[in-house]
From Swiss-Prot:
GO cellular component terms attached to this protein's record: cytosol
Organism: Aquifex aeolicus (strain VF5)
Catalytic activity: L-aspartate + H(+) = beta-alanine + CO2
Cofactor, free-text remark: Binds 1 pyruvoyl group covalently per subunit.
Top-level taxon of origin: Bacteria
Function noted in UniProt: Catalyzes the pyruvoyl-dependent decarboxylation of aspartate to produce beta-alanine.
Description of how the protein assembles with itself and partners: Heterooctamer of four alpha and four beta subunits.
Principal subcellular localization: cytoplasm
Protein name: Aspartate 1-decarboxylase
Keywords for the protein's UniProt record, in alphabetical order: Autocatalytic cleavage, Cytoplasm, Decarboxylase, Lyase, Pantothenate biosynthesis, Pyruvate, Schiff base, Zymogen
UniProt record similarity statement: Belongs to the PanD family.
Regions annotated as coiled coil: none
Residues with PTM Pyruvic acid (Ser): S25
Residues at which substrate binds: T57, G73, A74, A75
Length: 124
């Protein structure tokens, strides 16, 4: 049996822009994508802390170390510049893989720079 579990999470990102007329997706600093083990066009869940909106889209790389977090296309209706969001990705794991399972957790500052990166199943 496969279980779908959190693969990675980037916590409290600040939206830097929103472009309603772009084709779609979420543009994310390439460095943050690497830290969270996200590949271009990978499906992500986005949770808007400011307004409670939750939606799925896919991620595309923005310039490395830019801090860019841009909502594109229809997603631009679900958040605004300055909103705080969480990005989560999920994967399926076998029971054997779960024996050593730990999701990647990335915490950022107000400039979307990573301040803590850990792999943990600890629940606070």
């Amino acid at each position: 049996m496969l279980r779908e579990m959190l693969k990675s999470k980037i916590h409290r990102l600040t939206v830097t822009d929103a472009d309603l007329h772009y084709e779609g997706s979420l543009s994310l600093d390439e460095y943050l994508m690497e830290l969270a083990d996200l590949k271009p066009f990978e499906k992500i869940d986005v949770y808007n802390i400011n307004n409670g909106a939750r939606f799925q889209t896919y991620v595309i790389p923005a310039p490395r170390y830019s801090g860019e977090v841009k909502l594109n296309g229809a997603a631009a209706r679900l958040g605004h510049k300055g909103d705080l969001i969480i990005i989560a990705s999920y994967a399926q794991y076998t029971e054997e893989e779960l024996e050593n399972y730990a999701p990647k957790l990335i915490f950022v500052n107000e400039k979307n720079q990573p301040v803590e990166v850990k792999e943990s199943t600890e629940v606070k």
